[in-house]
Amino acid sequence: MSAISLINSGVAWFVAAAVLAFLFSFQKALSGWIAGIGGAVGSLYTAAAGFTVLTGAVGVSGALSLVSYDVQISPLNAIWLITLGLCGLFVSLYNIDWHRHAQVKCNGLQINMLMAAAVCAVIASNLGMFVVMAEVMALCAVFLTSNSKEGKLWFALGRLGTLLLVIACWLLWQRYGTLDLCLLDMRMQQLPLGSDIWLLGVIGFGLLAGIIPLHGWVPQAHANASAPAAALFSTVVMKIGLLGMLTLSLLGGNAPLWWGIALLVLGMITAFVGGLYALMEHNIQRLLAYHTLENIGIILLGLGAGVTGIALEQPALIALGLVGGLYHLLNHSLFKSVLFLGAGSVWFRTGHRDIEKLGGIGKKMPVISIAMLVGLMAMAALPPLNGFAGEWVIYQSFFKLSNSGAFVARLLGPLLAVGLAITGALAVMSVSVVALAICCVIGGVAAPWLLPMLSAAVPLPLEPANTTVSQPMITLLLIACPLLPFIIMAICKGDRLPSRSRGAAWVCGYDHEKSMVITAHGFAMPVKQAFAPVLKLRKWLNPVSLVPGW
């Protein structure tokens, strides 16, 4: 099947699953099965369409058969299709068991319509239709929030972003006479895109992507949504905002230097502040939402490095920045799906989302705990997992940036590299979470083979590294990294220690109390005290003070 046929089938499955899940919503279990199976099949078709275009390295165009909707699939947006398809597959399967909980409402209509709208936004050949489909997707996401206050906050901020994007589209139409992306690209080579339109687009799409300080809806929406919905917010909805920002920045291929620097600065602020705010949270979904902001910032750092490379006319910087950002976009979606779905499984079993109350959960849920440990290690960018591979390529782009002749680039390159370094169930549920964890391992170990595939999305070749170490050897070294401590322990351990007696810990003669146990809050306290002025900015400079705060 061609990529257009695959994408037609995928959208049809999403729409059919949404309609049938709504019609059978009176029977929750049946509705869950229909939504889950239909969404999983639609996601498979979507990922297959993206993989076909990416491996072929040639874009295709056509139309959706259900409606008169012109589409184009390039190797660049094929990466988004693969990301949406992989995450949608496991979220849909997970959602089948999710419907078995007594407190869960049917969500098949909203989730499948969200996926269909997201796919249509990615493949849109017209910027106006891109904005319309992104709006439909965002509205579906709003209805997935379980609390009306958080839904109103997201609705208000989302409509502000849409208004800015509509103004940007109107200005584009007045200036260029079209909203077709191919025609815009050709005409902007003669008449470059104005910075006023670019700023409107970056703010509008930035509200959708959740870049700081436009992130007001992100933690509240994630904390008050179901686990499948929260996973889609991070892996689908916010990534569409990044696609919009990148699309505007690449049109015409003549971006000025300050655009790239602005994206780098926004990425650095989002990555650092998002990771810092995560230390204050106890609700696991709210904590993961702030870590999503951190990774959105890291992805934006890579994409910003690519845009900076365009302005400086440095092909290696363009290739490294874009490939690193795109690979981390895919990797983040995988390991964040592991964590959100794993957190949902814990809530399903215990009824708690407070991490301070989940001590010893590994004994009750060993499979989910191991899978979440893999996801956490990937989020921490530890080798040999996929989070390390994407961030390492972004590091390389910063080193390349520091070698540039431009003074501002030589200044920002090392600073950005240092900033990035400090940022730091049931059967079907378990299968979905474990499968995603396995994907995280594969994404790291197989990075030497996967990264060249992503370079098809960048019209410039990656520079080959000057090394005599083969790709299989690199893979073996990555696999050996987590095994090395155990090997050293086995070799260096002495004779077996004598049996020890267990008793209460010595606490200066006082009785041991629960308050004496080291908690996550206490562990992070030194960092909170060191950055107290930054953390207080949430109260002093709150742009959404009229609605529920950050």
Residue ranges and their predicted role:
Residues 71-85, 193-205, 408-424, 466-485:
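Hydrophobic alpha-helical transmembrane segments
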Residues 430, 435-443, 454, 458-550:
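Membrane-interface and transmembrane segments of multi-pass membrane proteins
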Residues 59-75, 401-411, 460-474, 513-515:
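Interfacial loop/helix-cap signal at membrane boundaries in integral membrane proteins
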Residues 1-9, 16-109, 177-189, 456-457, ...:
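Transmembrane helix-loop-helix hairpins at membrane boundaries of multipass inner-membrane proteins
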Residues 18-22, 93, 275, 484-494:
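Alpha-helical transmembrane segments
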Residues 46-55, 441-448, 490:
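Alpha-helical transmembrane segments of multi-pass membrane proteins
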Residues 90-100, 105-130, 139-429, 442-447:
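Hydrophobic transmembrane alpha-helices and their helix-loop junctions in integral membrane proteins
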